[in-house]
């Protein structure tokens, strides 16, 4: 009986943690969408590189970004998957910082989902081409910052 109760409690805890993670990922995605453009920092040898991005989508509880495999930024992400993202809300007084590691997802499902959510990219990318790259964040930490409120941090 105790073993069944223990297993039940473990299952419930896992479900709560999973739900919290999904909510955190969605919160980060919504914030990025509100900002519009976000900037991702990578490393090229010993030189930092920063570029504007605009695609952030949630699939299967993971936050995805999109780029092209032929781009230098993709090669940098594969050589060193650690990154930082920052974005500022239109007010200019609130911003987000995100760090973690990026994992390439070559599945057609992920590519198609991200492209379907961002149809303007379909003139340059396809779920079936060898160039489209969608990457998801692992070990993500998001810091929501403001000039007038304490920083809030969530992990996803």
Q: What spans do the regions from the language model cover?
A:
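Bacterial Sec-dependent N-terminal signal peptides
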Residues: 1-21
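Short, basic/aromatic recognition patches
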Residues: 21-30
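A short, Trp-centered hydrophobic/proline-enriched beta-strand micro-motif
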Residues: 30-45, 83-87
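A mature extracytoplasmic/lumenal domain signature
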Residues: 44, 69, 89, 102, ...
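Short, exposed beta-strand/loop patches in secreted or surface proteins that constitute
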Residues: 54-57, 102
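A short mixed-secondary-structure module that forms the rim of ligand-binding clefts
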Residues: 56-91
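Active-site-adjacent structural patch at catalytic or cofactor/ligand-binding sites
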Residues: 79-83, 94-103
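Charged, gly/pro-rich active-site loop segments
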Residues: 97-156
């Amino acid at each position: 009986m105790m073993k069944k109760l223990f297993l039940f409690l473990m299952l419930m805890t896992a479900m709560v943690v999973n739900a919290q993670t999904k909510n955190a990922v969605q919160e980060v995605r919504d914030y990025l969408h509100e900002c519009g453009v976000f900037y991702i920092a990578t490393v090229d040898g010993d030189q930092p590189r920063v570029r504007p991005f605009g695609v952030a989508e949630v699939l299967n509880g993971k936050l995805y970004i999109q780029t092209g495999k032929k781009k230098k930024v993709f090669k940098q992400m594969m050589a060193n998957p650690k990154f930082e993202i920052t974005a500022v809300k239109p007010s200019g007084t609130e911003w987000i910082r995100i760090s973690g590691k990026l994992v390439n997802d070559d599945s057609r499902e992920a590519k198609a989902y991200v492209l379907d959510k961002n149809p303007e990219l379909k003139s340059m990318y396809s779920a079936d081409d060898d160039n489209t790259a969608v990457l998801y964040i692992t070990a993500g930490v998001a810091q929501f910052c403001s000039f007038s409120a304490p920083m809030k941090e969530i992990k996803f």
